[in-house]
């Protein structure tokens, strides 16, 4: 049976689970071009079809790779949460903070920069990392 305490580890594991789910979305569900992608490029799908014929096939493969990386980040985050973070191994806080910033943190910031439709969802996905780090510092 997995213990819920310390809460910081459980919340971090939840953040890792969200990344697993996001990875699965990118691998199996996310279309190559979203409506927001076309808006950002100031294109419509019919306008872009002839210009970007092979782009969609290429993007599908790009998103497989990105999805696998996101999934792996989530998997490693869950492992870290239930091992080093839970036992407060030296350096665990810094690694988790840096990992959060360089993964979901940067993804969220960039999505705000481009005005993504998913920016608020990504911000919510960032909260478990922030809460886990705060609770870790508070020894909770």
Where in the sequence are the language-model features?
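Membrane-interface helix-boundary signature
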Residues: 1-11, 52-62, 89-93, 114-118
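Hydrophobic alpha-helical transmembrane segments of polytopic
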Residues: 8-18, 66, 73, 92-103, ...
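Helix-loop junctions at the membrane-solvent interface of multi-pass transporters
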Residues: 28-29, 112-113, 138-139
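Juxtamembrane helix-break-helix junctions at the cytosolic face
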Residues: 74-93
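Hydrophobic, membrane-inserted alpha-helices
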Residues: 76-80, 100-110
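Membrane-helix boundary connector in multi-pass membrane proteins
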Residues: 104-123
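Membrane-water interface at the C-terminal end of transmembrane alpha helices
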Residues: 128-140
């Amino acid at each position: 049976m997995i213990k819920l305490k310390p809460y910081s580890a459980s919340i971090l594991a939840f953040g890792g689970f969200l990344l697993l789910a996001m990875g699965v979305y990118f691998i199996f569900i996310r279309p190559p071009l979203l409506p927001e992608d076309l808006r950002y490029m100031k294109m419509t799908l019919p306008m872009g079809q002839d210009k970007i014929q092979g782009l969609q096939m290429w993007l599908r493969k790009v998103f497989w790779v990105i999805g696998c990386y996101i999934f792996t980040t989530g998997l490693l985050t869950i492992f870290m949460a239930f091992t080093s973070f839970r036992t407060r191994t030296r350096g665990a806080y810094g690694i988790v903070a840096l990992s959060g910033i360089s993964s979901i943190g940067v993804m969220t910031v960039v999505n705000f920069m481009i005005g993504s439709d998913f920016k608020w969802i990504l911000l919510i996905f960032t909260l478990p990392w922030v809460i886990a780090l705060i609770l870790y510092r508070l020894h909770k």
